[in-house]
């Protein structure tokens, strides 16, 4: 017998082999609700990153980064003797995965370190950038996260080349595993583009045009070197990143004012990406067999373009070249489509040979800024007014690198800009004395005596708070934006009922505030949440349980002028399984949309389960449909949803294309209940059924109420960053 045959693991170690997902690829995936647990986090349980960052000597870090910029390493030499352009690309690509559709992606968790992003074709050779940073990360340790360090390095890179940045905020906390909740597309090959249908309609929520790209194909759509067609892709992709035309032009031109692309030779000379590379590569990828594989011989995108005569110094030369020459199509040494200036002198410096010069070159997507009429108008203004260009780029860069951080309350450090920006969803600071315990009790009594039902109170508070997205920290009850456009008109918020509830609560607010002295007030944002808490307490009382739902005042009311209607439109629920709502019919089944919503609310599977069961019996369905209201005691916080769902005396059959179901008595055939896929999944999915059985047991009523209250409190406070 050979040594190999004695190995007890014939085929795979723990976690190997055929998975449940392989057997049942359409199985509802609950793992996305249990990411980033303490079991994957190496930090101490009491570690507070915000406090650690506050102890950081940011000026010292920046000095070390500044020295790094011009300390070229033989193993990966700096172009033009300066790593700044490489680090700008690293920071840009860290932040640039953000998309507005679901708020996922972005720089907030340092995901560029992990698959798939660390191995995307568009991130080729950024592994070297992070390795160059390791000595600085090692020096400052846990006081600065990788997520913060990558963005800070991009800022220092810009500053080291003469550009004045708008500011920097820390506060991005690292995670320790890939984010499994982000849908990057269904393509199974790099640079695939099955995400398009019809007349180049891009699948939501995606923003990038091809699998493995951050934004658009720099050669043009699918490699077609058409600047006008490329402009269409640029406009859609950048809009899905929350950028308007001016911000888009500023970012492209600003970023391409520095450095170069790399296409010294044919891409087939590349080795595998980091995740596929051999163990001896130690996490590095794209080892090239072309020449030395680095410096003059480096290959990254396959394009070989240097935009300006000042690749390591801020200037207006990008626009000077863009408008100063006519351009003709050519190919890089790697065979990629790019453009070269006609009738031009060789004015562009070589990245590694001080004696060599090159002709000006541009990408197809650069020429879009000249030949698309709207982009051209902005570009020409920037060309003629460099100070406007510098300001626009500084602001757009700050937005790009901070968009997924949420409100300013999360910003840390001495370089946080004083100016509040509309895209930060500003909320006024608390400017009055807050209500106390006695006030809270008195307000609850007024609310419960107002004639509003438990259902109305709970529904309104849920609608206000559940807009929160843990992906980009937007939404939530703070600000009371449910009373403003666009939220007040969303179908999911039942505008007619909402107006009635708000009118009643505003009356209570006015009476209370008018009777106070000493500057004490209650905001409508607080009152909406307090009303929901009062509704939950009353529902528990109706079921025979005396509970006090936690409530902490301190929310404020935003103004319409502080609310970007277009920006907030992306928060509108297309589905909310917690309220048995779908705006339309979608490719994804309703239960998958429920899990997606739960993940954005940072809920676990047990929390999702108890909230659905509780909200059903509290009669909070949008439109007051009876689907899933498995109780004869609505507005009582009972575990009836689970008891009746698990009742084997009920037989379920589809009635409407397998989206709506009838539950009939097995013996008599009499109709007992109706339910949706979201309701029935808690009986059909083995994990969810196991949770439903906990709450459907005879001894579970008290636990059910406790767990519902805890999960409710969590959702109501998701945006209370002041309480963290």
UniProtKB/Swiss-Prot annotation:
Q: Which cellular component appears as one GO term in the record?
A: cytosol
Q: Which domain of life is it from?
A: Bacteria
One Gene Ontology term from the biological process aspect of the record: hydrogen peroxide catabolic process
PROSITE patterns named among the record's database cross-references: PEROXIDASE_1 (PS00435), PEROXIDASE_2 (PS00436), PEROXIDASE_4 (PS50873)
Q: Which Pfam families match?
A: peroxidase
Binding-site list for heme b: 256
Please indicate if the UniProt record lists Repressor as a keyword.
no
Q: Which CDD domains match?
A: catalase_peroxidase_1, catalase_peroxidase_2
PTM comment: the record says: Formation of the three residue Trp-Tyr-Met cross-link is important for the catalase, but not the peroxidase activity of the enzyme.
Question: What EC class is this?
Answer: oxidoreductase
Reaction(s) catalysed by this chain's protein:
H2O2 + AH2 = A + 2 H2O; 2 H2O2 = O2 + 2 H2O
- Binding note for cofactor: Binds 1 heme b (iron(II)-protoporphyrin IX) group per dimer.
Active-site residue numbers:
93
Q: Which family does it belong to?
A: Belongs to the peroxidase family. Peroxidase/catalase subfamily.
Q: What does this protein do?
A: Bifunctional enzyme with both catalase and broad-spectrum peroxidase activity.
Query: What name appears for this protein in its UniProt entry?
Result: Catalase-peroxidase
The organism is: Ralstonia nicotianae (strain ATCC BAA-1114 / GMI1000)
Q: Which gene encodes it?
A: katG
């Amino acid at each position: 017998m050979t040594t190999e045959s004695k190995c007890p693991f014939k085929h795979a170690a723990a976690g190997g082999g055929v998975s449940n997902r392989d057997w049942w690829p359409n199985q509802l995936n609950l793992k996305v609700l249990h990411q980033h647990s303490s079991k994957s986090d190496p930090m101490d349980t009491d570690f507070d990153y915000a406090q650690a960052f506050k102890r950081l000597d940011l000026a010292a870090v920046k000095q070390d980064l500044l020295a790094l910029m011009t300390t070229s390493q033989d193993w990966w030499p700096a172009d033009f003797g300066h790593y700044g352009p490489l680090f700008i690309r690293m920071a840009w690509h860290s932040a640039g995965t953000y998309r507005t559709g679901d708020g996922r992606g972005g720089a907030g968790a340092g995901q560029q370190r992990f698959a798939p992003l660390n191995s995307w074709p568009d991130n080729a050779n950024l592994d070297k950038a992070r390795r160059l940073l390791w000595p600085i990360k090692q020096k400052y340790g846990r006081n600065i996260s990788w997520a913060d360090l990558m963005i800070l390095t991009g800022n220092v890179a810009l500053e080291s080349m003469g550009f004045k940045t708008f500011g920097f905020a820390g506060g991005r906390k690292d995670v320790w595993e890939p984010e499994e909740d982000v849908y990057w597309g269904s393509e199974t090959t790099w640079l695939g583009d099955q995400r398009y249908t019809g007349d180049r309609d891009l699948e939501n929520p995606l923003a990038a045009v091809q699998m493995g790209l951050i934004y658009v194909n720099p050669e043009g759509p699918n490699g077609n070197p058409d600047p006008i067609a490329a402009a269409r892709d640029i406009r859609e992709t950048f809009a899905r990143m929350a950028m308007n035309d001016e911000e888009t032009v500023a970012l492209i031109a600003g970023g391409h004012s520095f450095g170069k692309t790399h296409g010294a030779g044919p891409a087939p000379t590349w080795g595998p990406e980091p995740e596929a590379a051999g163990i001896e590569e130690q996490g590095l990828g794209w080892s090239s067999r072309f020449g030395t594989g680095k410096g003059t011989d480096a290959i990254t995108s396959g394009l070989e373009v240097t935009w300006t005569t000042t690749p390591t110094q801020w200037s207006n030369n990008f626009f000077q070249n863009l408008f100063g020459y006519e351009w003709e199509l050519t190919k890089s040494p790697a065979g990629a489509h790019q453009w070269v200036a006609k009738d031009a002198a060789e004015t562009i410096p070589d990245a590694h040979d001080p004696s060599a010069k090159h002709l000006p070159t541009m990408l197809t997507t650069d020429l879009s800024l000249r030949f698309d009429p709207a982009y051209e108008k902005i570009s020409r203004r920037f060309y003629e007014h460099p100070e406007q260009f510098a300001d626009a780029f500084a602001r757009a860069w700050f937005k790009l690198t901070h968009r997924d951080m949420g409100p300013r309350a999360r910003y840390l450090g001495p370089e946080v800009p004083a100016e509040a920006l509309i895209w930060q969803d500003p909320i006024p600071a608390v400017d009055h004395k807050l209500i106390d315990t006695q006030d809270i009790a008195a307000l609850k009594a007024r609310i419960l005596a107002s004639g509003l039902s438990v259902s109305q109170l709970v529904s309104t508070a849920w609608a206000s708070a559940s807009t929160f997205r843990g992906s980009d920290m937007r939404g939530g009850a703070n600000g009371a934006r449910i009373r403003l456009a666009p939220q007040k008109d969303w179908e999911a918020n039942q505008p007619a009922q909402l107006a009635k509830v708000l009118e009643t609560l505003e009356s209570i607010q006015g009476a209370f505030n008018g009777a106070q002295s000493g500057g004490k007030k209650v905001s409508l944002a607080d009152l909406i949440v307090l009303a929901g808490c009062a509704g939950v307490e009353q529902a528990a009382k109706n079921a025979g349980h005396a509970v006090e739902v936690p409530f902490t005042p301190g929310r404020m009311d935003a103004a319409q002028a502080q609310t970007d209607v277009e920006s907030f439109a992306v928060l509108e629920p297309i589905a909310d399984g917690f309220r048995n709502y779908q705006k339309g019919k979608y490719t994804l089944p309703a239960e998958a949309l429920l899990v997606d919503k739960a993940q954005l609310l940072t809920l676990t599977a047990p929390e999702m389960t108890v909230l659905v069961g509780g909200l059903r019996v509290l009669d909070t369905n949008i439109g007051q449909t009876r689907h899933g209201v498995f109780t004869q005691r609505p507005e009582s916080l009972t575990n009836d949803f689970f008891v009746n769902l698990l009742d084997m005396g009920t037989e379920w059959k589809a009635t409407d294309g397998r989206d709506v179901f009838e539950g009939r008595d097995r013996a008599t055939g009499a109709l007992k209940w109706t339910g949706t896929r979201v309701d029935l999944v808690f009986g059909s999915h083995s994990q969810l059924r196991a949770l439903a059985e906990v709450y459907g047991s005879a001894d579970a009523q008290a636990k059910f109420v406790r767990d519902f209250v805890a999960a409710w409190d969590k959702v109501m406070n998701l945006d209370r960053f002041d309480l963290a």
